[in-house]
């Protein structure tokens, strides 16, 4: 019975994604963020079933505008011990939180009476 408990604990730990960020990231080549984008692409069916995940060019990209302030408001939920400076690159670990916020933000903006923001994520640069 004890070995079963250890096995179940190990399986649970393997299935739980890590939520901690031990220290502020200095740059996008930090070992903790290398390879994040390919992982996001592998998981895109779980994250956004009908969307592709195009590269975010910079913080001024239409898909990111307004999200940093939303992320700052929710930083206690996402990374309680971290400050959130400007997003530098799509490989930044902060994109993990931005993807879920992007879906939420897109839904909020689709209530816009002008309808200008009611695009799919992949259409945004051209809509």
Swiss-Prot record:
The keyword Ribosomal protein does not apply. The turripeptide OL172 conotoxin-like contains 2 disulfide bonds. It is found in: Secreted. This is Turripeptide OL172. The modification Pyrrolidone carboxylic acid is found at residues 44, 76, 107. One of its GO terms (cellular component) is extracellular region. Residues 42-43, 73-75, 104-106 form a propeptide. Acts as a neurotoxin by inhibiting an ion channel. One of its GO terms (molecular function) is ion channel regulator activity. The lineage of its organism: Eukaryota, Metazoa, Spiralia, Lophotrochozoa, Mollusca. Residues 1-20 form the signal peptide. It comes from Iotyrris olangoensis. The cysteine framework of the turripeptide OL172 conotoxin-like is C-CC-C. Expressed by the venom duct. The keyword Disulfide bond applies. It comes from the Eukaryota. Its main location: secreted. Keywords: Cleavage on pair of basic residues, Disulfide bond, Ion channel impairing toxin, Neurotoxin, Pyrrolidone carboxylic acid, Repeat, Secreted, Signal, Toxin.
């Amino acid at each position: 019975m004890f070995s079963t408990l250890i096995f179940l604990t190990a399986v649970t730990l393997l299935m739980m994604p890590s939520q901690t960020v031990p220290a502020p990231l200095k740059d996008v080549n930090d070992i903790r963020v290398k390879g994040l984008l390919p992982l996001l692409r592998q998981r895109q069916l779980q994250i956004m079933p009908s969307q592709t995940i195009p590269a975010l060019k910079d913080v001024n990209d239409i898909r990111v505008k307004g999200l940093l302030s939303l992320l700052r408001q929710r930083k206690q939920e996402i990374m309680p011990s971290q400050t959130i400076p400007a997003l530098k690159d799509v490989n930044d670990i902060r994109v993990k939180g931005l993807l879920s916020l992007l879906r939420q933000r897109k839904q909020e903006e689709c209530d816009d009476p002008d309808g200008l923001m009611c695009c799919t994520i992949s259409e945004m640069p051209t809509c």
